[in-house]
Amino acid sequence: MKVKRYDIYFADLNPAKGSEIKKIRPVVIISQDEMNTYLETVVICPLTSKIHPLWKSRLQIRCVNKNAEIAVDQIRTISKQRLKNRIDRLSDAKAAQLRKLITDMYGE
């Protein structure tokens, strides 16, 4: 499977523990393409349809013509076997906003 950074896939995030986002849902790939080529895992941020405009850990987007949020506070590594079909891709502008948000939250 050829997975690219900023592609959006459906992924099966079950089983989950506690407050982890679960179910089959869209996820955005945030790991570097070189990692995606050679590893059997990818780093993702799950998407949710529950919109929290005041949460600084979330980025609002449109995905498959629906409002969604990228849950940067729920970054995790998953097996590529959890990925289903590719459904969308972040725009360059949203990818830049996502990189900035990740840096602001976890950087330096």
What are these regions (language model features)?
Residues M1-E108:
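Conserved functional hotspots at enzyme active or ligand-binding sites that engage polyanionic ligands
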